[in-house]
Amino acid sequence: MKMEADVVIVGTGVGGLFSALSLPRDQKIIMITKSDLESSDSFLAQGGICMLHDKDDYDSYFEDTMKAGHYENRKESVDLMIRSSREIIHDLIGYGVDFQKQEADESGNEAADNGGETAAIQDIYAFTREGAHSRPRILFHADITGKEITSKLLAQVKQLSNVTLLEYTTMSDIIVENDECRGIIAQDKDGNEFEIHAENTIWASGGIGGRYKHSTNFPHLTGDALTISEKHGIRLEHLDYVQIHPTTLYSKKPGRRFLISESVRGEGAVLLNSKKERFVNELLPRDVVTKAIREEMEKEGTDHVWLSMEKLGKETIMGHFPNIYQHCLEEGYDVTKECIPVVPAQHYFMGGVWVDSDSKTSMEHL
């Protein structure tokens, strides 16, 4: 079988969906995903999404980002991310994403919202804080922000007549003609191979968590684009830059680790050792907190540390972190009354396929 498209997008998470929505409507687009449409890590994200408050926030936002990246970040990319963040958030709201709004003020009046015509986003929505940020600049939807964003984008894409969505379809290779990418070779769930020819190919295929025993990722995310890149000499970068999230719920059960969002620490949750003593500033960058946890575990001879959310209060926990509360309850922990055991696990892949500031790889049309 052979399919034709203007653009083929590998991956149906936030990156792939936003790309599809941003392309011209006269472009024929085919999107594929290895599993079902909702089994992408984008659906699992809990904490939120960062946004530049105003021009006065730029310098601290830039410095926070560079510091967290040990000043190895590509400055051009950091600048682009920060300066485009307000426009991206505006687009997401336009697609129906419902971020948490500010509570009513003392007079009982809620922040005005008429589509952003007269009120700025920062005057309407509530912001929380996460590690490495010097101020709250994260927009959120309870503790299921990823699900809120991705489900709304997916609903929008499903309405597009120019987009075809293929589930349970795996990219096994790319089609290369004259050193240019001209589409992909794919396999359906029965192992039948077919070609998707396209003028341009977009990889939005996720991370590498499936290669790890302990990860917060779905197991089918195995870094397929890396293997294909190595085969065709496509430039890769920083393959050793793998982020370990400090706090996942400790369990002896096999399978994906359940993430305990960094936002709980942003709201005041604290990390404790076996003696119930604090041992680290919980809002330091993730790699620093992870290192402190591992050192504490080694020093004490334990396989986890403890996280206390009790000081947040039941109202905040139930309102901001209902999913975490419910999952922990199912595992036998009431986070409103007791500490929970947490352990670091593989979470995010910061290396991968090299791209320029326009997200073009070293191969044309990819």
Predicted features, each with a name:
Residues 2-5, 190-200, 362-363:
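Core beta-strand elements of the Rossmann-like FAD/NAD(P) dinucleotide-binding domain
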Residues 7-31:
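N-terminal Rossmann-like FAD-binding beta1-loop-alpha1 element of flavoenzymes
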Residues 24-45:
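Glycine-rich FAD pyrophosphate-binding loop
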Residues 37, 228, 234-346:
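An anion/pyrophosphate-binding glycine-rich loop and adjacent beta-alpha core
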Residues 50-81:
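Glycine-rich active-site loop/strand segments that organize a redox cofactor
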Residues 75-86, 136-155, 166, 215-223, ...:
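Short beta-strand to alpha-helix junction loop
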Residues 93-192, 204, 248-251, 257, ...:
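Conserved redox-cofactor binding core of oxidoreductases
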Residues 200, 204-206, 358-366:
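Short FAD-binding loop at a beta-strand-to-alpha-helix junction that anchors the flavin cofactor
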